[in-house]
């Protein structure tokens, strides 16, 4: 049984708030009753159930009910394309989709049975028994090819839930502000299962992240002031946007915040430092779906700048031939329809462990660039320097013309005017100046500027901001070809 479900059963009479969404408050007793009715509604349902919905109280109830029935649960992020959703439906053999009204078209194209999420609002008492042995299939958006299904059972999830709660000293007094999709495993664990286990409260506000994406960078600060959270999880781009908002407004983050965990992509050291100066207690971590989403995490009592923290207690993390490898209770059972995973997991990430056990991540093993003189460069090294500048939302270093390094730049709303000016040499000089501390051979020799909408349309990045490098290389080649043909 998941620890969160066990805790919910133990608190089924509690009138304390478990989840808040806008003006709706769901107490633990209400949540238990709603989950019980949803479990009854799933009687006779197929063995594999997919969930495609926006963050909401309905999402929470459906998640817990599917889990309680012991079925295989496939949460699907809203940002997946229709082709990806069709692929997942077939790959996981989803027998039933639960969906909200926004995603009717997405589930219809799969041709699979589907049911609109309807949560019973009944005064009739209901209870449920938990069927053990449920499985989650987490589809990673990935940076190449179709999403792969990572299989995680109760043991793997419970390890991560408990380890996260201990790492951040989670208590029933915590107020977790959720701005990322629950379909992302890290957000589901931190925003749903950890608060449930300790008896805390989760506040759902997906509008804030959407507002930031549309250019209103003050939305996170506004949400935090209104909700006074103690814990949040952000991707680096949202942390940078919040910092930019605070700098512009000359404000500080609410004093209620004690932990802002940051993951999903590399976070520039200077951004972490600036966040702290602005009252944002940002702690960078590292993980992957294949390891229950978390491998290492800086914490309030164990933090080191330039690292992603120490590995979670109970994990055996080693560097083998420069690559981070992991063994332990949260390592996946395997990929769907592949051989069961055994032994140590090679992450594909390059890294080191310092003398005090803090993990340092250098970048992806398969993303190393080689210049014309045979020099190896980890692009993440340069990209972190470029994205230190608030004018740059995202940056990717790739091969351009004649084997030279080309930076693909996605400006922020603040940086659009700078990059829109017709002065290529001045802009390139500014980019190279941001990388002043590295050798000349590692600096960008060229750059291409791409708007947020164009980058999204070309699907150049995952939702957490990780670059799809193969697609970006092809995109850059196409841009140069178009320029030649003009």
Where are these regions (language model features)?
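Conserved pre-ATP/AMP-binding loop-to-beta segment of ANL
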Residues: 3, 121-139, 146, 169-175
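Conserved AMP-binding/adenylate-forming core of the ANL superfamily
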Residues: 15-43, 50, 54-56, 64, ...
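Conserved AMP-binding A3 loop
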Residues: 27-28, 135-162
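Conserved AMP-binding/adenylation subdomain of ANL enzymes
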Residues: 158-175, 182-231, 236-249
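Gly/Ser/Thr-rich phosphate-binding loop
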Residues: 198, 230-233, 242-303
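Conserved ATP/PPi-binding loop(s) of AMP-dependent carboxylate-activating enzymes
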Residues: 307-313, 318-344, 358, 373-377
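AMP-binding/adenylate-forming catalytic core of the ANL superfamily
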Residues: 328, 350-442
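Conserved C-terminal "lid"/linker of ANL adenylate-forming enzymes
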Residues: 369, 394, 433-486
């Amino acid at each position: 049984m998941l620890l969160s479900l066990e805790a919910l059963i133990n608190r089924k009479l509690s009138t304390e708030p478990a989840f808040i969404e806008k003006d709706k408050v769901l107490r633990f007793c209400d949540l238990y009753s709603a989950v019980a009715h949803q479990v009854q509604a799933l009687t006779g349902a197929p063995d594999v159930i997919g969930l495609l919905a926006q963050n909401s109280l309905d999402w929470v109830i459906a998640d817990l009910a599917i889990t309680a029935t012991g079925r295989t649960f496939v949460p699907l992020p809203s940002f997946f394309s229709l082709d990806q959703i069709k692929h997942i439906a077939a790959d996981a053999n989803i027998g039933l989709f639960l969906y909200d009204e926004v995603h009717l078209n997405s589930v219809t194209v799969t041709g699979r049975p589907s049911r609109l999420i309807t949560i019973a609002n009944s005064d009739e008492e209901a209870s449920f028994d938990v069927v053990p042995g449920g499985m989650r299939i987490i589809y990673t958006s990935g940076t190449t090819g179709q999403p792969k299904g990572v299989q995680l059972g109760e043991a793997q999830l419970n390890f991560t839930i408990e380890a996260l709660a201990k790492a951040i000293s989670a208590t029933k007094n915590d107020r977790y502000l959720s701005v990322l999709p629950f379909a992302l495993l890290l957000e589901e664990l931190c925003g749903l299962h950890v608060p449930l286990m300790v008896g805390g409260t989760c506040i759902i506000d997906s509008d804030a992240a959407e507002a930031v994406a549309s250019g209103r960078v003050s939305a996170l600060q506004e949400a935090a002031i209104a909700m006074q959270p103690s814990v949040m999880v952000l991707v680096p781009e949202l942390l940078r946007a919040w910092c930019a908002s605070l700098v512009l407004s000359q404000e500080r983050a609410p004093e209620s915040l004690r932990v802002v965990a940051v993951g999903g992509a590399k976070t520039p050291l200077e951004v972490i430092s600036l966040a702290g100066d602005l009252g944002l207690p940002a702690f960078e971590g590292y993980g992957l779906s294949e390891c229950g989403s978390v491998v290492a995490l800086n914490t309030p009592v164990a933090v080191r700048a330039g690292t992603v923290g120490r590995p979670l207690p109970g994990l055996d993390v080693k560097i083998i031939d420069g690559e981070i490898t992991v063994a332990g209770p949260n390592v996946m059972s395997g990929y769907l329809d592949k051989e069961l995973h055994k032994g140590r997991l090679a992450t594909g990430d390059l890294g080191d462990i310092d003398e005090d056990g803090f993990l340092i991540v250098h970048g992806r093993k398969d993303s190393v660039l080689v210049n014309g003189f045979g020099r190896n460069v980890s692009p993440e090294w340069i990209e972190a320097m470029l994205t230190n500048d608030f004018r740059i939302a995202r940056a990717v270093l790739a091969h351009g013309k004649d084997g030279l390094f080309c930076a693909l730049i996605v400006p922020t709303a603040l940086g659009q005017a700078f990059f829109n000016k017709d002065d290529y040499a001045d802009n390139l000089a500014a980019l190279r100046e941001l990388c002043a501390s590295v050798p000349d051979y590692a600096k960008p020799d060229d750059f291409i500027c791409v708007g947020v909408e164009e980058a999204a349309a070309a699907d150049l990045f995952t939702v957490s901001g990780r670059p799809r490098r193969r697609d970006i290389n092809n995109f850059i080649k196409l841009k140069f070809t178009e320029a030649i043909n003009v």
